Amino acid sequence: MSVVHKACLIALLFVSSGVAQQCMDSASDCAANAGSCFTRPVSQVLQNRCQRTCNTCDCRDEANNCAASINLCQNPTFEPLVRDRCQKTCGLCAGCGFISSGIVPLVVTSAPSRRVSVTFANNVQVNCGNTLTTAQVANQPTVTWEAQPNDRYTLIMVDPDFPSAANGQQGQRLHWWVINIPGNNIAGGTTLAAFQPSTPAANTGVHRYVFLVYRQPAAINSPLLNNLVVQDSERPGFGTTAFATQFNLGSPYAGNFYRSQA
């Protein structure tokens, strides 16, 4: 990658407040109407029209009417039933605490509807904000999600609390970045930033480490990313939403996170 191309990439993606181009869908306006994906009867129209356009409204469930039951996700009586019945069809009730923990809107603008399964050595599981030690997360984990074998996905892991929980002015620190993943076979994707374990510095408070998966509308083939290898000095300041917007990835498909401190 030339110096010019790499400078362009950094300007586009590694400035979290930067402005990236919007979803290229002028006909159906799917991105603007994404908030109605789960509102009947409009949702049925949007689901059929927009599923592949901007990766919005990917819920295609007619039998269980899961989309209409989304308001029950916070109801202690009905949530277990809704989650059991609808998790696999529409990924509902899987917000994973992204809003209450502040990941929305700091990292992404909406919570993913599915959960990423993240397992470190000795069967240590990431579970929606649980606290893990640096020793427990020292090695690259096994990461899987509900994937379609013919689709391509992007995996991102970031720390939005860098350099410290009280002072995250440098933006998100990139810990892992793989694009064009077939299904959930991460080894078959293109690694732009190799996995880097979370090692928060002493006296910097509790850090959130966020895993995000985006479903790609097509393979990502951009001169900005060809032959890119992100250096350690370039990891701070990554913009997850800027990247997703630049490549029309829509909302995050799946996610999870844990907390850790020195």
From Swiss-Prot:
Domain ShKT: 23-57, 59-93
Subcellular location: Secreted
Disulfides per UniProt: C23-C57, C30-C50, C37-C54, C59-C93, C66-C86, C73-C90
Gene Ontology MF terms: lipid binding
A Pfam family this chain is assigned to: PBP
Primary subcellular site in the record, as a coarse category: secreted
The keyword Disulfide bond is annotated on this UniProt entry: yes
Family per record: Belongs to the phosphatidylethanolamine-binding protein family.
Name used for this protein in its record: 26 kDa secreted antigen
Organism per entry: Toxocara canis (Canine roundworm)
Taxon lineage: Eukaryota, Metazoa, Ecdysozoa, Nematoda, Chromadorea
